[in-house]
Amino acid sequence: MATLEELQKEINNHEGQLVIARQKVKDAEKQYEKDPDDLNKRALSDRESIAQSIQGKIDELRRQLADRVAAGKNIGKERDPTGLDPGDHLKEKSMLSYGNVIDLNHLDIDEPTGQTADWLSIVVYLTSFVVPILLKALYMLTTRGRQTTKDNKGMRIRFKDDSSFEDVNGIRKPKHLFLSMPNAQSSMKADEITPGRFRTAICGLYPAQVKARNLISPVMSVIGFLALAKNWTERVEEWLDLPCKLLSEPSPTSLTKGPSTNRDYLNQRQGALAKMETKEAQAVRKHAIDAGCNLIDHIDSPSSIWVFAGAPDRCPPTCLFIAGMAELGAFFAVLQDMRNTIMASKTIGTSEEKLKKKSSFYQSYLRRTQSMGIQLDQRIIVLFMVDWGKEAVDSFHLGDDMDPELRGLAQALIDQKVKEISNQEPLKL
């Protein structure tokens, strides 16, 4: 629970926002008087609603402040001589002191808490926009993702672009793309679009567009994604034709009646997945195809690897039930854990990387995939790791350490200069 000082500070902040909101209302009134069209009328109505909302928050905060002050005045009268708070069931005072009262009124336990997304609603919403604004937003959440998230954490933001508009009574009105930027305490609605859900959905809906524009998340670029993606078609075809260690008998479906291959194993896996495919997954693919999206059909599709260019968070729902795709995403999640472990073992690296000693991309990916209705075949992940793991690890970006001779020369100059100007011990470079 907030302290009296925090409540007063929050009231002051909202009062400052209210002054600005009321000024915007006045500006909108002047604009509407000058040009009384529907667009200006809507703008005036929106700004009045914002001002009323802020005023409502201020009134609520003032009520909370008054309640806290009243509770503080009565606390001495209500306290039991034993030191127990009213309503406490203990017979003797606990060794622990009383802490905050946690308000649960805003929680609804019947609502999803972010574990399961309503992918059909999300895909329907996203495909209602033109492709340019979606790809530009993806750029802001991949290439510039860290800064965008940092600047807007804990808020619901809107992306706008001239390519995205809708006609309202013959008036061209901008159509904004809404996204939520949660913090650690946020509880997401089932159809609420977070950066992770957005990257997952867009990369699954438009993999060829993502590939053409090279839209890669920084967390993917440092784990050798480009090294595997640059010759993906040849790489995956070669891998599919390799003898499969998981099938000992000759394949009955092979044209040459030769040894079973990885392709044969994935065909078996596809048959099992076809029986597991959920109605929601079928509806998501159908709507995406009807909306004009070019979805991948097989792991050997030219753009299939690019569905994971956004991040190793989860497998997109548009390719979840394609044999090998969910496991390919899990392979990238394992690579991310491997790189974080390597960085934590080094003497260099950012403080954030050093803290990631217990990296859990894979466990998170596994949990999310299970919540979407599929169990990973970890034997396929083993095949990926055996055939591509070393090449990916050799392509990791681990940060270049300084040459020992260069470091020694630089440190000597630092030591000399520090001794000239200070009595302190020189720091190490």
From Swiss-Prot:
Region (Interaction with host RPS19): 150-175
Disulfide bonds: none
Region (Homomultimerization): 1-79, 100-125, 373-421
Gene Ontology cellular component list: host cell Golgi apparatus; host cell perinuclear region of cytoplasm; ribonucleoprotein complex; viral nucleocapsid
Source superkingdom: Viruses
Chaperone activity as annotated region, ranges: 1-100
Region ranges (Interaction with host DAXX): 373-429
InterPro entries in UniProt: Hanta_nucleocap (IPR002214)
Primary subcellular site in the record, as a coarse category: virion
Annotated segments matching region Interaction with glycoprotein N: 80-248
Region described as Viral panhandle binding: spans on this chain: 1-175
Pfam family, any one: Hanta_nucleocap
Enzyme class, broadest EC rank: hydrolase
Motif (YxxL): 178-181
Residues at the site labelled Important for the endonuclease activity: 88, 103
Keyword hit for DNA-binding: no
Region described as Disordered: spans on this chain: 27-46
Domain remark in the UniProt entry: The N-terminus is required for chaperone activity and, in trimeric form, this region likely serves in high affinity vRNA panhandle recognition. The N-terminus also contains a coiled coil region, which probably participates in but is insufficient to initiate N trimerization. The YxxL motif is indispensable for the interaction with host MAP1LC3B. The central region is involved in specific RNA-binding. Has distinct cap- and RNA-binding sites so it can bind simultaneously both the vRNA and mRNA cap.
Annotated function: Encapsidates the genome protecting it from nucleases. The encapsidated genomic RNA is termed the nucleocapsid (NC) and serves as template for transcription and replication. The nucleocapsid has a left-handed helical structure. As a trimer, specifically binds and acts as a chaperone to unwind the panhandle structure formed by the viral RNA (vRNA) termini. Involved in the transcription and replication initiation of vRNA by mediating primer annealing. Plays a role in cap snatching by sequestering capped RNAs in P bodies for use by the viral RdRp during transcription initiation.
Assembly notes: Homotrimer. Homomultimer. Homomultimerizes and binds to viral genomic RNA to form the nucleocapsid. Interacts with host MAP1LC3B; this interaction participates to the protection of Gn from virus-triggered autophagy. Interacts with host SNAP29; this interaction participates to the protection of glycoprotein N from virus-triggered autophagy. Interacts (via N-terminus) with host RPS19; this interaction probably mediates the loading of the 40S ribosomal subunit on viral capped mRNA during N-mediated translation initiation. Interacts with the viral RdRp. Interacts with host SUMO1 (via N-terminus).
Stated name of the protein: Nucleoprotein
Naturally occurring in which organism (per UniProt): Dobrava-Belgrade orthohantavirus
Gene name tied to this protein: N
